[in-house]
């Protein structure tokens, strides 16, 4: 069975360091949650078949617990825990003994059984400069001064108004002044933890999407969907949160006015790639980070989900930072080094960070921005428009990636500029 290390994508660096290096992803047996699994069911099952399958699982699990073989494992298991339904994809998490896992893997209704994983957050260090990223988004890829605060960012004054950006992350400080009351507490999957952001990552990402100073879509709403806390998470919580987001977007009838940002990455994990793909088929746009391994993104999840918008990081002078993943699955490049945004520790707190965690929300913000000013009825239309606006052949050392830099299209439209 596949092992996975899965984490948020901000990189550690010290003040003055302009070439931060990524921490290695350390996958190993200790990452596995003992006795806990994610089970994916085959497509096309009826509600009655799924209900009967769950009854069968409970019966088999109970019988195996009564046997000596199950008790000998030393792991307490609790059976089915949570069910996830994304479009026509059905999965569930559960605590099972080894014999039950063997029985599940042979069940005709089961597509796959994967061990659940701990998910680790990258360490970050504060560095106090840089505001180049926004200016880059409206400059057609023209190199901009790194530390200048005078770079112009031109945009239509609708600026994401009436659009919802869902941030699956560590939570958001919705009281931060940058959000001007547009922050919403959506879902908290972490048990016995408040719906706050004690780590900073989610607030930082949300600020790049929709902060009044640091955001691409300055009037968009940001919805906190907390699947991480301080240090680690598992797919049990990540899938629960992603499932909630898809349901909330669908039930609120806002598929063409919503975007999901996933500034997370780990080794290839098919069940979650499948979930992102099913959301796309349901009419929902997801923007994801390419990853910080300095390798081909095809081996990362959710970057390898074929219809997510996968974002690599570019520096202010159009070079690829050594940490950014690359490859044919990287759809677009956006600012991802020394980017300033909101932070933990207070309603005015800020921090400057690097990583594809910063690049992804630039594009999620661009999606929200475009949704507010154009009729983009489907994820395919969103992706096509975002890619149509890109500036080609600017990124040095893009490897074999599509060489396309994010751009908001302002110079091609007679938009009213902000006051």
Curated annotation (Swiss-Prot):
Disulfide bond residue pairs: none
Lineage, top ranks: Eukaryota, Fungi, Dikarya, Ascomycota, Pezizomycotina
Protein's name according to its UniProt entry: Subtilisin-like protease 2
Predominant subcellular localization, coarse grouping: secreted
Active site: 169 (charge relay system), 201 (charge relay system), 357 (charge relay system)
InterPro entries, alphabetized: PCSK9_ProteinaseK-like, Peptidase_S8/S53_dom, Peptidase_S8/S53_dom_sf, Peptidase_S8_Asp-AS, Peptidase_S8_His-AS, Peptidase_S8_Ser-AS, Peptidase_S8_subtilisin-like, Peptidase_S8_subtilisin-rel
GO terms of molecular function: serine-type endopeptidase activity
Function summary: Secreted subtilisin-like serine protease with keratinolytic activity that contributes to pathogenicity.
Superkingdom assignment: Eukaryota
Protein localization: Secreted
Entry keyword set: Glycoprotein, Hydrolase, Protease, Secreted, Serine protease, Signal, Virulence, Zymogen
Classification via PANTHER family: ALKALINE PROTEASE 1-RELATED (PTHR43806:SF58), PEPTIDASE S8 (PTHR43806)
GO cellular component term, pick one: extracellular region
Propeptide: 17-122
Family: Belongs to the peptidase S8 family.
EC number: 3.4.21.-
Signal peptide bounds: 1-16
Limits of the Inhibitor I9 domain: 36-122
Any Gene Ontology biological process: proteolysis
Pfam families: Inhibitor_I9, Peptidase_S8
Glycosylation sites: 248, 261, 348, 388
Residue stretches making up the Peptidase S8 domain: 131-419
Gene name for this UniProt entry: SUB2
